[in-house]
Regions:
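NAD(P)+-binding Rossmann beta1-loop-alpha1 motif at the extreme N-terminus of oxidoreductases
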Residues: 1-42, 46-50, 120, 182-184
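Short acidic capping loops at alpha-helix termini that bridge into adjacent secondary structure
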Residues: 16-19, 77-79, 189
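Rossmann-like NAD(P)(H) cofactor-binding subdomain of soluble oxidoreductases
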Residues: 27, 36, 44-125
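Internal alpha-helical scaffold of NAD(P)-dependent oxidoreductase catalytic cores
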Residues: 92-106, 122-158, 169-210, 253
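Short pre-catalytic strand/loop immediately N-terminal to key active-site residues, enriched for Gly-Thr
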Residues: 108, 156-161, 213-218
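NAD(P)-dependent Rossmann-like dehydrogenase/reductase catalytic/cofactor-binding core
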Residues: 196-253
Length: 253
């Protein structure tokens, strides 16, 4: 996810490459950004010390070691901390980051999805101990890489399922519809192109007019026609139920 975020920031309008420092313990992971103009380091402390916004995007099992590593170099009076780690509570993070004088950083729990690489993410933001101005700054950054929603920590699990796991669910529909297109007689590449453009068209319509999906479905559903027959077959097979069950299953840890 960290690499996807860097790609999105580089394609965006807020950061110049020289504004970004990327840190990873493995040089090989940094090599893909060698020609991008960003600063590269294998020292997390070096990366964190000079940043205005420190973003930690790591696997859950290494989060504690990374956060404790950078605590001593962070200046909580001027720096904000963004943590992109699924399932990690803010209380735990703040306990790890608490300094001897009891101070903690302005914290943001952030969950984007992989489409952030193309500036098409749906990103959830939870401010913890942050000012309105700080929250405005972080939201602007993630609005530049798609769309963002400032929400409550209790909804992060559901948001992860709906938007992050949801990418995979949407792609599974694309795969299924593409395979159906092949069975109907199209070449595989043509079928995928047709399905992708159709999905894009559906999304564009909903974004443009704000209608409920069912209102748009009604526009193309003629009584006794092909569309309603297909929809009913999908429902008989449990389409809506399967989607909801998948979403609910994805929120259980």
């Amino acid at each position: 996810m960290g690499g996807a975020m860097v790609n999105g920031f580089l394609k965006g309008d807020i950061f110049r490459p020289s504004d970004i420092t990327v840190s990873n313990r493995t040089q090989g992971a940094l090599d893909r950004f060698a020609d991008s103009g960003v600063s590269l380091t294998t020292d997390n402390g070096v990366a964190a010390a000079e940043a205005d916004i420190v973003c930690v995007a790591v696997k859950p099992w290494v989060a504690e070691s990374v956060l404790r590593e950078i605590k001593s170099v962070m200046d909580y009076n001027r720096q904000m901390l963004v943590v992109v780690v699924a399932g990690l509570p803010s209380a735990t993070i703040l306990e790890w980051m608490k300094k001897e004088d009891g101070t903690v950083p302005a914290l943001f729990l952030v969950i984007p999805n992989i489409a952030i690489a193309e500036r098409s993410s749906m990103t959830f933001i939870v401010p913890v101990g942050a000012s309105d101005e700080q929250t405005k700054t972080i939201k602007a950054i993630f609005d530049d890489t798609g769309s963002s929603l400032v929400t409550e920590e209790r909804l992060l699990g559901a948001g992860t399922t709906l938007a992050s796991c949801g990418i995979a669910y949407a792609m599974r529909y694309v795969r299924a519809a593409s395979e159906g297109g092949v069975e109907l007689g199209f070449r595989a590449d043509d079928a995928k192109h047709i399905v992708l453009q159709t999905v894009k068209g559906a999304v564009d319509l909903l974004l443009a007019n704000g209608n409920h999906p069912e209102a748009e479905i009604d526009k193309v559903t003629t009584p006794g026609g092909l569309t309603i027959r297909g929809l009913n077959e999908m429902e008989h097979a449990g389409f809506t139920s399967a989607v909801i069950r998948g979403l609910k299953a994805g929120t259980h840890t």
